[in-house]
Amino acid sequence: TIALSEEPPQLDSTRSTDASSFIVLAHTMEGLISYDNNDQLIPGVAARWEIRDDGATFWIREEAKWSDGEPVTAHDFEFAWTRVLDPTTAAEYAFILYPIKNAEAVNQGDLPKEMLGVRALSDTILEVDFERPTPYFDKLAAFNTYFPVREDFFESTNGRYGADADMLLYNGPY
């Protein structure tokens, strides 16, 4: 049970900005990396990761599943992050992805989304290129805006993704 002072306005992690939505999402979704009770980074959907000066690689746990039993894949992160940066999404927290190569230019509509420095090399390997060295990217990857979104489910909601509980697919620990 979670005690909230208000109903979350919507639970689309790519667009959420309020505390109520963040609290619910933190209990129902899991990103590549999570925080433990001592605010230390721990594996989330990623079994392991490597941060380099020029980018990062994340290896997805094969047992990571969505609430419908389908596997969580690197493609789900690529889709979500591309959606955050799509100018038509108008995500207020898009800037938090700007360490990713070409993210700001994609978000401003100056480059096509295909130029974004994130790609699923396979279902279990996500590769990220940086604009500049970002040694704290592991901390960013734990933020709600970096949560995965499965494209086929998103498309099936006809623009209502995250508007109601049945319009959201969960991958969190509960």
Language model features with spans:
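N-terminal lobe/hinge region of extracytoplasmic solute-binding protein
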Residues: 3-54, 169-171
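Gly/Pro-rich hinge or "lid" segments in bacterial periplasmic/extracellular proteins
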Residues: 129-174
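Aromatic- and charge-enriched surface segment that lines or borders ligand/interaction sites
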Residues: 48-96, 127
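Second-shell loop/turn segments in exported
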Residues: 15, 60-68, 114-117, 164, ...
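Extracellular/periplasmic catalytic domains that process cell-envelope and extracellular macromolecules
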Residues: 49-52, 109-112, 119-122, 167-168
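Sec-exported extracytoplasmic/periplasmic mature domains
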Residues: 33-37, 61-65, 82-90, 133-135, ...
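Short, well-ordered beta-strand elements
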Residues: 1-9, 55-58, 77-80, 126-128, ...
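Short Gly/aromatic-enriched secondary-structure transition segments
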Residues: 14-24, 72-75, 140-146
